Structure formats: structure tokens, C-alpha cells
Swiss-Prot record:
PANTHER family: DNA-DIRECTED RNA POLYMERASE I SUBUNIT 2. GO terms for biological process: DNA-templated transcription. This is DNA-directed RNA polymerase subunit beta. PROSITE patterns: RNA_POL_BETA.
């Protein structure tokens, strides 16, 4: 493959053996596509806002003479862009305008003639918009809406697995779950009666539902049972014989016909007997009259003369009724066919416990169950039942639910509506009875075919619909009130309920989460997270093991590795690398189609439901050059997800990639296949906590997944169109777009403004650094600037560190690690953290708070860093306790006399009646002020500092826009110049004239003249647009801010804190090998090799075997080899060897074991490109070892050889303190280490005087409350064990909650008296009060 200019800068050697058939799809699709569907107009009205509007409108008044119809909607442009919203703390949203039509009909006219139509555009609140990176900015913070995995609507058959009843009998149940509406359950009880529940309420016999649907007893029995027909012929009783029904029964009489005995009495009827009966075509047999006794009649038998019912439907037949039937002239009797084996009498038994007898009584019974205490009437009970399952407004199965329903009950696809029909309910009961009879299987709830994904768009739509329904009620009321002549649609609609519903969802739903912005990976994985929690989902407490477990349908859809440790394990999952959702919301994964043992290039996405019928081979199956399987038997997954061996011709599909199974975070772990799953889980989770270091360093040993994640995360700047770099500085990159990618008549210039030193949600620093140079050719989609934790467009979460696995004086006992001072000196793990501190000036009852430098009782030195407005300077270095913003609050104890008030007003002396409430730097923090923002309420006068900031912003905006205009103009005039020169103008002459005059030239060629006129128009457009943009920007900057009620001013101060690595910081590798730094050791004391090169971190070898994460050792070896090759290249560069030698050596490194898919041909590179590549490889040759398809031991050894290193990967080391050789070679290599966001600075804390808990009077706990350390039970036991009685007494009294003792002791210390008098601890009083509250009097006997 050819490499572009940018790609040639650094090429990662790929160890993958299998070609990449399908690139990793865009990683944020699940968020962006879902929201697009929500916002885009859908002509069919199946989804999004359109569907919500169509489901609620038209709203018809109660009398039916007026209706409010929906026409269409549009979204306005948002007022502020994303960046401005973040700074101002506002929501990035667009106003929703809906066109509505109010139609009123003529009451007098019989043909519903239209009397009046009013059309109007109505404002319906704001809809938050998604940014390009799949996030929402709500109140200035970036949030992510996590997708939810919930139970798909449809019908589910399940059993209690014998857990409900003490006998251990398995009780089966069926549940119809709609998308919205009431749930309908059917269940068996231990006596095998069938019951129904609506919305999980009290259970009713299931036949009540059937009666309510209008079925009679006879019809119900016809629906569920086969019949046996008996004939009365004289004194004989003949039975119509269906031989198959007799199988397995014991004959209670001789079965004979035509004089031949087929089965003797007492014998078991077998298949042989049945064959004989069928062969001789026996259709009737004589049965003794006792045989019919106890059988159940299938219909009412009525004495036609007297009208008396001899035997009712579902009544048992006795000798008496038999005689009566014969007497009444019945010759045939139909009874129900049941047996104990596979035709149970469940419905018949249920009818016997059913208290109802017709439709009305059944409806009454349902009404009483749903609305206990209300008297039912025929109308209300009928309406209630219809509204439950048969009203499209109240009940909707949705297309997904209907599809699942039809598949489950083997109905034809695409039939049926969103509501239930009688046939649906009967089919569910039939299938449930079949399952009870031993035919059919129960469903597996954890199967991904029964769980679907609900993404942002769908959840937002549901919330929006809830808001609309609230509005609908109000509109209906309003329409019924009459006087419609004066009303417009505008008056009818109150947007409050809609915006409240939407706001609540985006602001405080359980699934709307504060984005994890530690690093690019944590952003991407947060957006790809799938949660089973949340509204309509599971709760942590109720979720059992089965739901949390890995299911075989997760393969290629949900990652089996990445899930949190702790209470949420298995409930929060991550999407696999290639997975996507289909239209129904089920997860799909791609496969290559296989035809007759030949693997094609065709790729198909299959959902679990589709996949069930196919045999699918693994991605690492061996193929020959014609893509045919080479093995006689191939390992593949067959039915039910079980793996087995299959012939190549039986295989239907093959996996796309070895990385298909895991999520992107797990796919970043090299040699994942050699790690234990539990440790891999920790590794995947800890990469998300890595803090971006000062200088990003790409991993030497990667997996090839680093590039797609960095590009898709949106932290790096990616070229929208190809071109050439025309200008580059720290904050802006300008690209002159290629001719073939420009739209006709535009300037062809793309400008990218970079983000500089801004704060992330996790207080880490976001900063973009250009990685292109002037004149570089750029292709579309290539990286122009690196963001945090990216290096040349590759994800770089940590640093490559030289590690040795050996014990070192106990400093790496139990997962601690010894770090060399050199790591600190080189700032390898130095990170920048940005804190935002804000000060709010409010309008209080006693007067307004004021931001000022005039603070009572504060010395000059404390104010030295403030300006005259009382706000700290940018660039000031501050430490804990320093004032950042001076603020005074009015105190209101003293009532002033009018004379005093006058004097105060004249002399302005007010120091006495205000208290200092300034914003100070929190304890333990120090840093540099990097930015100050002042927000002032509309109508409040801006202070000097605010005006300065405003002026600066205006200047910068004007400068930016002017530069932008200049760049665009230059591009435009270059085109004009070319046009004129091509038309015969003289270049030297042109350059003497003012550029604007060029546009006034005339050209003989008409086509070129048109082009020139077009360019002149564009020039005008540019100027106009510039003026417009500048005006808009000016208005935004000058405009007062929209602050919360009662707030006059907000000042935000941003502090940058530089944190070097220190003992107590937590670090980790990528294999779940985490530890804490125990000591920073001087370089000269670290172990070193023969060349005098010291190691940088010493790790404990005992941390490897028991944890079974061997991947870290392989990574260390491969890292050593990669670095060795880099050292060789570095040596060649230093010796200034000729380029050819360099080229052949690098070529050798890339070609080594070149049986993989990667082909690098350096002969096509120019000398300059080879040198640039070598320069980037001197720190080590980056390698990729894809998950499950990576480098093996032999390949690592070959690479070590090429780097001139021992193939064992072990090196002799010397002790840095004594210079002695260690007694055996040590594993040394390069491991990629991450610094995690668990820094000791944030955790270290010591309490001095602080606040106490109100009730117990004990110090609070935790750093945030400036709390103390709890002296708990175990600590008390320790003191008791030592008999340290006085120490214990102090601990329990004066040092804790003896209030009087505390104060006395303080006074004593002040006066130099070292005594203490312990009193009663407050918690003792508390327990006394608690016991009294139980009604037991307890008093302290003070004798």
C-alpha cells in the first residue's frame, strides 16, 4: 500500500498475520446516528420529533368541533457555539418552532364544513443539540447520554425454575411487554390453574380475560381442547378412535374391533399397537359405560322439552347424566380430550375457579381489581378494559415488539398492529399451555435477541412525547372552554411542560452522565457504554448473577472484558469494536460470507436473531491464498452458540477480525491473549484513568488500535479536506484546499483554530499542538494537531519506561514500585491540572455583596496580587489561603439611627458593617492563575476589570476575524491573478495596481469574464460576512450575562497546577499491573547494565506469576527489541552513515517475518523521507501486535537479534550503590506505564481545627469536610490490649465529643496549665435519648 506524506513520518511495524478486511467503523456512530434520527425530519413519521408530534396531534376538543393540527417543525440556529456555551455555563441548544393549524368546524352544518383555519408558528422550548463529538453541553458542562440495554418489547415465556413453591414444581409464565402501556402476565399456580395479572396486580383466573373479550364457556373450551365423540347405540357405548391419542396409556378394557383384540386390558399401549389399529383403519371401538364417567362435556346439553340443562359445558358426566342424556334423545356426546401426559385439563380446571359467568361480570371483576373501591358501571368497566390493551393512544407494542411477538408465536412477519387482538392473547395462552404440556421451550431473558439498545435519540423522543402529552391535556381543556374566535395556536400551547421534561432528562436522568474526560480513550468508551441500569432497566440490588454474566450472544457485540469492578459488574458493558445497532435496536456484528468453503470479500451484519441458523468460523481459521479453508475440520460456532468442528463446506460465515470480540479499550492491550481475564479487565479500566502527560509519548508496543481511537475521539484536529499547509502557529492552522476538493467559486481555504490550555471535566488540561509544518501536503482525514494524550495522531496515554523485574531492598514489596529520579527530572510523568474556582456576588436581604479590593481587617500583603477591582492578576502564583477575589457581604446586626445613616452616606464609612467573604485558594493547593472570566448581570454596571477583559476579547475577535479575512482574500486574489494572467495580463503590471482594481478589469473571453464577475461577487460577500461576524461577536461580548436569579456578578478564576510524580502516586501498566510509588531513588543508586544505562523503574517479579498477566513480560521483551532497533538507527544517524545503509536496515526491520498483511517498501521513499522516518524511529521502532493475532515468541527473538540484544530478553545488571554484579541476569525492557488519576496530592489530608457533627459533636469525616480520622472499635481494642487507659480516656472524651472538656482543655492550654478534666461524651447523651425514644427511661446516676 502507498503511504501518504503524513503517514511516512512514522510507520508502525505490524505483526498481524491476517489482512484487515474491514476497518474499525467510526466509533461514535451509536451516539451521532441516534441523535440524527431524532432531529431529522422523517417523512414516514416513524421516529424522532416527527413521530412524537404525529402520535399526539391532531388534538381534538371534547365536543369534536375544533382540532389543533400539526403541520411541521424547524430548529433555529443556536445562539452561542459550543465553546461559548462552555465558558458562559449555558446549554448548547436550539429553539424548536412548530407550525400548527387550528381548525374549527361549523356546528350547524351536517357535513362538518370548515368554519375557520388559523395557522401559526409556535415556540416549543429548546432542544439540546449534540456536538460533533457525541456530547451535550448542559449548563456549561459536557455530558454524555449512555445507551441503555433493556428488555425488548414482545412476549416472553419463562419459568420460576422450581423456586416459588416448596414442592419444587416448575411453574411456567408468559408476559406480554409493550413499548408503552400495561403489562399482561399469564402464570400457572401449583394446582395447575392458569391465572392472569395486569400490571403485576392481584391475579385473576385467566379465563376472566377471555370472557371479557366476549367468549362463552363453550367457545373457550373449543379454543383450547380437542374432542372425544361417544355414540350411544342401544345399550352399547361407542367411542370414535384416534389411535395416536392412546400412546403411553394403560388400557382399562380390552380394545377390540371386528372380533380381534388389539390391546388386552391392563397392557400399556405402544407404538406397535397404534400401528396395528391404524393399519386396519379402526375408527370406532366399544367402550364400557364406566369409561365416560368423569369425562368433561364440551358444550351445554339441554333437555329440549323442558329447557333444563342436563349437563353444562365443562360439567363432569355421571351415570345419572348419561341416563338423562339417553332419555332426552342424545345419540352423540362430545367430551374434552385430556390426559396427564401432554394434554392437561388446565383451562377446564381454571373455568371451575372462575367466579364470572358472562362478559359483563368479567369486566366488573377486572374493574374491581384495577380500581378497588370504585363502583363499576357497564360503560366504565368496558372503557377501562379497552383502554388497557386495545387503544392505540394508551398501548403500543411498537414495530420491534410486534416483530418479536410474531416471531415468538410463529405468526407471519409484518402482520398485526401496535395493539393486541383477541387472536394474540389466545395464541399466547396456547403457547404457554403447550410449554406446560412439555412442547416448546422457555425463553432465555439474557439472550441479546431479547434485549435491545435504547440510545439517546429514542430516550429523548420518549421524554419529548411525555412533555407533549402534558401539553395535550391542557390544550384539550382550553379547546372545550369555548370562545375560539379570539384564540390562536400560540395561545393554546404552553411550552413549559415540554422544556421541563427535556431539561429534566438531559440534566438529571440517571443515564445523562458527566463526561469522563480524563483522556481520549475515556471519552470514547464513555460514549460507547451500554448500561442495564436506569429508568425502565434493572436496579443494582435486584440484578442477579445471570444478568451480569457473559452470554454467548455477547460475542462480537458486547465486550466480555471491559466492565466495572464492584456493584455494577456486568450491568455496565462496552460495545465491541465492530458492533452496531440495527433499525430495531438489536446489536449486530459483521461477518464475511462463506460460499462452498470459499471466504468472500462480502461483509454482512447479523443480529443474534439472524445468526441463530448459521455456522460461523473464527477469524483465525487458516486460509490459503485463494481464501479457502486449509483444514479438513474448522473450529466454528454452530446452533446455540456452542463451538465444535465442522467441514469447510458447511460453514456459512467467518469472523471479520480477531479484535471483533473485545471493546476498543481491551483492544489496546497488547498480548491480551496471554493475560488472565480479571487482570485484563483491570487493565482496560485503568487505561481510562490515565492522566495526559506533559509530552505525549506513543507506545512502542501497541496494537494498531491507537490511531482510530485518537482520530474518532475528536481531541485531535483532523483535516476536513486535503490540501497544503499555508500557515501554522500555536493557535491556528490554515490549509489551502486542493483544487479538486473545492466547491465551485469558494476561496478554497480551511482555517482550524486550536484549543489552548482549557480545563476538562476531570480538571486535566486540554491543549492542542500542531504536528504539521509549513508546506506539508495533507490528505483528507489526516491529523493536523495533536490533542491531549495523542502523538502524531496515535493515542498515547503514558510513557515508555525502562523497567527491570527484580526485588530492590523491599521498596517494591506488595506492588509498590521504585522509580528513578531521572523520570522526575525529565518530566516524564508531569501533568498539568486546571482548577476552576468561582466567586458569586449575590443580592442579599441586607444589600448587595460587592467585589472589591477594599476588604476589612486584611493586610496590604494579602492584597498584593489583586488589581483595583479586587480580582487577582493573570500570571500570579498563588498558594493555599491567598485571596483570589475580594468580596464583602453586608452584616446586619446593628440597627442604625437616621443621623448615623446620614453620616454614613456622607463619609461613606462602611468598613464596620460588612464582613469578608472573599474567594480564597483552597488549603493544600498552589498554582498559577491562567485565566479570569467576569460575568455581569444585565443592567449591572461592569467594573474596570470586566471592561478590560471585554476590550481584550473584542481585540482578539477582531484580530482573528481580520486574519481570517486576509487569508481568504489572499486565496481569492490569487485566483483572480491567475485568471487575469491566463487572459494575457502582465504580471508585473498587475502587481503595481491595487488588488481591488483587478476585479474591475474586463476580459474578452466571455466565460472568463463570468468567472471574474463571480469572484468579484464573492469578494463582496466576504467583506459583508466579515462585518456581520464582527458585529455578532461584538454583541455577544458586550451583552450582559444570563445569570441565576439574585446573582449580580460571577468571577471565575482558573488555576494551573503542575504536578510531578511523587511517592504515593498510583501507576499502572496496561495488563492490570498497578502499584504505588514507594520511593524516588537517585539515578546513581539504580541498577545499571554494562553500558552504564540505569533502569527507570524496578518492579517486583512476584507480581506476575500469581496474577497470570504474562502479557506484561512479553511486552517488556518486545519493547526492548523495539528500543534496540531504535538505538541502532540512532547510532547510524549520529555516525552520519549514508542513507542507503539506513534505508536497508529499516527495510530489514519492517520485512522481518513479513508473512503478515503489512508491506512497507522504502525504495519508494525519497532520501529526505527516509531521514525523517529514521529521526522519528531513533527512540524505538513502534510495533503493533493486534489482539489474538500478535507477535509470538520466535518473532520477538528475531527482533531482539536484529537489535543486537540477547534473545533471552535478560541482561546482567550491576547494583548502583556498590557496583557489584547481581547474581543472575534480570529481565529488562520497555513497558508502557500510565500515571493514574489517583494522585497523593488529592488524597493527603490532615485535620486541625474544623467543624463538628451537630448531633454527636464528633469531628466530620473525609477530606472534603476537612474531617478527622475515625478512632473506631478496632483501634479502641488495640489501646485496651496495651492497657493504655488514660490515652483511651482522652481519645473517647476531650479529643472527640466531650464538649465541655474540649473547651476547658483549650482554656487550660492557653493559660499554660497542662491538666484535663474529662466529662461526659456527647454520644453518650445521644444513646440515652435514643433509648428514651423507645419508651425506656434511662438516667445517669451521678453519685
Amino acid at each position: 500500500m502507498g503511504y501518504s506524506y503524513s503517514e511516512k513520518k512514522r510507520i508502525r511495524k505490524d505483526f498481524g498475520k491476517r489482512p484487515q478486511v474491514l476497518n474499525v467503523p467510526y466509533l461514535l456512530t451509536i451516539q451521532l446516528d441516534s441523535f440524527d434520527k431524532f432531529i431529522q425530519k422523517d417523512p414516514e413519521g416513524q421516529q424522532g420529533l416527527e413521530a412524537a408530534f404525529r402520535s399526539v396531534f391532531p388534538i381534538v376538543s371534547n365536543n369534536g368541533y375544533t382540532e389543533l393540527q400539526y403541520v411541521d417543525y424547524r430548529l433555529e440556529e443556536p445562539e452561542f457555539d459550543v465553546r461559548e456555551c462552555q465558558i458562559r455555563g449555558s446549554t448548547y441548544a436550539a429553539g424548536l418552532r412548530v407550525k400548527l393549524r387550528l381548525v374549527s368546524y361549523d356546528k350547524e352544518s351536517s357535513s362538518r364544513a370548515v368554519k375557520d383555519i388559523k395557522e401559526n408558528e409556535v415556540y416549543m422550548g429548546e432542544i439540546p443539540l449534540m456536538t460533533d463529538n457525541g456530547t451535550f453541553v448542559i449548563n456549561g458542562t459536557e455530558r454524555v447520554i449512555v445507551s441503555q440495554l433493556h428488555r425488548s418489547p414482545g412476549v416472553f415465556f419463562d419459568s420460576d425454575k422450581g423456586k416459588t413453591h416448596s414442592s419444587g414444581k416448575v411453574l411456567y409464565n408468559a408476559r406480554i411487554i409493550p413499548y408503552r402501556g400495561s403489562w399482561l402476565d399469564f402464570e400457572f399456580d401449583p394446582k395447575d390453574n392458569l391465572f392472569a395479572r395486569i400490571d403485576r396486580r392481584r391475579k385473576l383466573p385467566a379465563t376472566i380475560i377471555l370472557r371479557a373479550l366476549g367468549y362463552t364457556t363453550e367457545e373457550i373450551l373449543n379454543l383450547f381442547f380437542d374432542k372425544i365423540t361417544f355414540e350411544i347405540a342401544g345399550d352399547k357405548l361407542l367411542m370414535t378412535l384416534v389411535p395416536e391419542r392412546l400412546r403411553g396409556e394403560t388400557a382399562s378394557f380390552d380394545i377390540e374391533a371386528n372380533g380381534k383384540v388389539y390391546v388386552e386390558r391392563g397392557r400399556r399401549i405402544t407404538a406397535r399397537h397404534i400401528k396395528a389399529l391404524e393399519k386396519d383403519n379402526i375408527s370406532q371401538v366399544v367402550v364400557p359405560s364406566e369409561y365416560i364417567l368423569g369425562k368433561v362435556a364440551s358444550k351445554d346439553y339441554v333437555d329440549l322439552e323442558s329447557g333444563e340443562i342436563i349437563c353444562p359445558a365443562n360439567g363432569e358426566i355421571s351415570l345419572e347424566t348419561l341416563a338423562k342424556l339417553a332419555q332426552a334423545g342424545y345419540t352423540t356426546i362430545e367430551t374434552l380430550f385430556t390426559n396427564d401426559l401432554d394434554y392437561g385439563p388446565y383451562i377446564s380446571e381454571t373455568l371451575r375457579v372462575d367466579p364470572t359467568y358472562d362478559k359483563t361480570s368479567a369486566l366488573y371483576e377486572i374493574y374491581r381489581m384495577m380500581r378497588p373501591g370504585e363502583p363499576p358501571t357497564p360503560e366504565s368497566s368496558e372503557a377501562l378494559f379497552n383502554n388497557l390493551f386495545f387503544s392505540a393512544e394508551r398501548y403500543d407494542l411498537s414495530t420491534v415488539g410486534r416483530m418479536k411477538f410474531n416471531r415468538s408465536l410463529a405468526f407471519p412477519e409484518g402482520e398485526g398492529a401496535g395493539i393486541l387482538s383477541n387472536e394474540d392473547i389466545i395464541a399466547v395462552m396456547r403457547k404457554l399451555i403447550d410449554i406446560r404440556n412439555g412442547r416448546g421451550e422457555v425463553d432465555d431473558i439474557d439472550h441479546l435477541g431479547n434485549r435491545r439498545i435504547r440510545s439517546v435519540g429514542e430516550m429523548a423522543e420518549n421524554q419529548f412525547r411525555i412533555g407533549l402529552v402534558r401539553v395535550e391535556r391542557a390544550v384539550k381543556e382550553r379547546l372545550s372552554l369555548g370562545d375560539l374566535d379570539a384564540i390562536t395556536p400560540q395561545d393554546l400551547i404552553n411550552p413549559k411542560p415540554i422544556s421541563a421534561a427535556v431539561k429534566e432528562f438531559f440534566g438529571s436522568s440517571q443515564l445523562s452522565q458527566f463526561m469522563d474526560q480524563n483522556n481520549p480513550l475515556s471519552e470514547v468508551t464513555h460514549k460507547r457504554r451500554i448500561s442495564a441500569l436506569g429508568p425502565g432497566g434493572l436496579t443494582r440490588e435486584r440484578a442477579g448473577f445471570e444478568v451480569r454474566d457473559v452470554h454467548n450472544t455477547h460475542y462480537g457485540r458486547l465486550c466480555p472484558i471491559e466492565t466495572p469492578e464492584g456493584p455494577n459488574i456486568g450491568l455496565i458493558n462496552s460495545l465491541s469494536a465492530f458492533a452496531r445497532t440495527n433499525d430495531y435496536g438489536f446489536l449486530e456484528t459483521p461477518y464475511r460470507k462463506v460460499v462452498d468453503g470459499q471466504v468472500t470479500e462480502e461483509i454482512e451484519y447479523l443480529s443474534v436473531i439472524d445468526e441463530a441458523n448459521y455456522i460461523i468460523a473464527q477469524a483465525n481459521s487458516n486460509l490459503d491464498e485463494n481464501n479457502r479453508f486449509t483444514d479438513a475440520f474448522v473450529t466454528a460456532r454452530g446452533e446455540r452458540g456452542e463451538s465444535g468442528l465442522y467441514k469447510p463446506e458447511d460453514i456459512h460465515y467467518m469472523d471479520v477480525s480477531t479484535q471483533q470480540v473485545v471493546s476498543v479499550a481491551a483492544a489496546l492491550i497488547p498480548f491480551l491473549e496471554h493475560d488472565d481475564a480479571n487482570r485484563a479487565l483491570m487493565g482496560a479500566n485503568m487505561q481510562r484513568q490515565a492522566v495526559p502527560t506533559l509530552r505525549a509519548d506513543k507506545p512502542l508496543v501497541g496494537t494498531g488500535m491507537e490511531k482510530p481511537i485518537a482520530l474518532d475521539s475528536g481531541v485531535a484536529v483532523v483535516a476536513k479536506r486535503g490540501g497544503t499547509v499555508q500557515y501554522v502557529d500555536a493557535s491556528r492552522i490554515v490549509i489551502k484546499v486542493n483544487e479538486d476538493e473545492t466547491i465551485a467559486g469558494e476561496a478554497g481555504i480551511d482555517i482550524y483554530n486550536l484549543i489552548k490550555y482549557t480545563r476538562s471535566n476531570q480538571n486535566t488540561c486540554i491543549n492542542q499542538i500542531p504536528c504539521v509544518n509549513l508546506g506539508d501536503p495533507i490528505n483528507r482525514g489526516e491529523v493536523l494537531a495533536d490533542g491531549p494524550s495523542t502523538d502524531l495522531g496515535e493515542l498515547a496515554l503514558g510513557q515508555n519506561i525502562r523497567v527491570a523485574f527484580m526485588p530492590w531492598n523491599g521498596y517494591n514489596f506488595e506492588d509498590s514500585m521504585l522509580v528513578s529520579e531521572r523520570v522526575v527530572q525529565q518530566d516524564r510523568f508531569t501533568t498539568i491540572h486546571i482548577q476552576e474556582l468561582s466567586c458569586v456576588a449575590r443580592d442579599t436581604k441586607l444589600g448587595a455583596e460587592e467585589i472589591t479590593a477594599d476588604i476589612p481587617n486584611v493586610g496590604e500583603s494579602a492584597l498584593s496580587k489583586l488589581d483595583e477591582s479586587g480580582i487577582v492578576y493573570v500570571g500570579a502564583e498563588v498558594k493555599g489561603g491567598d485571596i483570589l477575589v475580594g468580596k464583602v457581604t453586608p452584616k446586619g446586626e446593628t440597627q442604625l439611627t437616621p443621623e448615623e445613616k446620614l453620616l454614613r452616606a456622607i463619609f461613606g464609612e462602611k468598613a464596620s458593617d460588612v464582613k469578608d467573604s472573599s474567594l480564597r485558594v483552597p488549603n493544600g493547593t498552589s498554582g498559577t492563575v491562567i485565566d479570569v472570566q467576569v460575568f455581569t448581570r444585565d443592567g449591572v454596571e461592569k467594573d474596570k476589570r470586566a471592561l478590560e477583559i471585554e476590550e481584550m476579547q473584542l481585540r482578539e475577535a477582531k484580530k482573528d476575524l481580520t486574519e481570517e479575512l486576509e487569508i481568504l482574500e489572499a486565496g481569492l486574489f490569487a485566483r483572480v491573478r491567475n485568471l487575469l494572467i491566463s487572459s494575457g495580463a502582465d504580471a508585473a503590471q498587475l502587481d503595481k495596481v491595487d488588488r481591488t482594481k483587478w476585479l474591475e478589469q474586463t476580459i474578452a473571453d466571455e466565460e472568463k469574464q463570468n468567472q471574474l464577475e463571480q469572484l468579484a461577487e464573492q469578494y463582496e460577500e466576504l467583506r459583508k460576512e466579515f462585518e456581520h461576524k464582527l458585529e455578532v461577536k461584538r454583541k455577544k461580548i458586550i451583552k450582559g450575562d444570563d445569570l441565576a436569579p439574585g446573582v449580580l456578578k460571577v468571577v471565575k478564576v482558573y488555576l494551573a497546577v503542575k504536578r510531578q510524580i511523587q511517592p504515593g502516586d498510583k501507576m499502572a501498566g496496561r495488563h492490570g499491573n498497578k502499584g504505588v510509588i514507594s520511593k524516588i531513588n537517585p539515578v546513581e543508586d539504580m541498577p545499571y547494565d554494562e553500558n552504564g544505562q540505569p533502569v527507570e523503574i524496578v518492579l517486583n517479579p512476584l507480581g506476575v506469576p500469581s496474577r497470570m498477566n504474562i502479557g506484561q513480560i512479553l511486552e517488556t521483551h518486545l519493547g526492548l527489541a523495539a528500543k534496540g532497533i531504535g538505538d541502532q538507527i540512532n547510532a547510524m544517524l549520529k555516525q552520519k552513515q549514508e542513507v542507503e545503509k539506513l534505508r536497508s536496515y529499516i527495510q530489514k526491520a519492517y520485512d522481518l517475518l513479513g508473512n503478515g498483511s503489512q508491506k512497507v517498501d522504502l525504495s519508494t521513499f525519497t532520501d529526505e523521507e527516509v531521514l525523517r522516518l529514521a529521526g522519528n524511529l531513533r527512540k524505538g521502532l513502534p510495533v503493533a501486535t493486534p489482539v489474538f493475532d500478535g507477535a509470538d515468541e520466535a518473532e520477538i527473538k528475531e527482533l531482539l537479534k536484529l537489535g543486537g540484544l540477547p534473545t533471552s530478553g535478560q541482561i546482567t545488571l550491576y547494583d548502583g550503590r556498590t557496583g557489584e554484579k547481581f547474581e543472575r541476569p534480570v529481565t529488562v525492557g520497555y513497558m508502557y506505564m500510565l500515571k493514574l488519576n489517583h494522585l497523593v496530592d488529592d488524597k493527603m489530608h490532615a485535620r486541625s481545627t474544623g467543624s463538628y457533627s451537630l448531633v454527636t459533636q464528633q469531628p466530620l469525616g473525609g477530606k472534603a469536610q476537612f474531617g478527622g480520622q475515625r478512632f473506631g472499635e478496632m483501634e479502641v481494642w488495640a489501646l485496651e490490649a496495651y492497657g493504655a487507659a488514660y490515652t483511651l480516656q482522652e481519645m473517647l472524651t476531650v479529643k472527640s465529643d466531650d464538649v465541655n472538656g474540649r473547651t476547658k482543655m483549650y482554656k487550660n492550654i492557653v493559660s499554660g496549665n497542662q491538666h484535663m478534666e474529662p466529662g461526659t461524651p456527647e454520644s453518650f447523651n445521644v444513646i440515652m435519648k435514643e433509648i428514651r425514644s423507645l419508651g425506656l427511661n434511662i438516667e445517669l446516676d451521678e453519685e
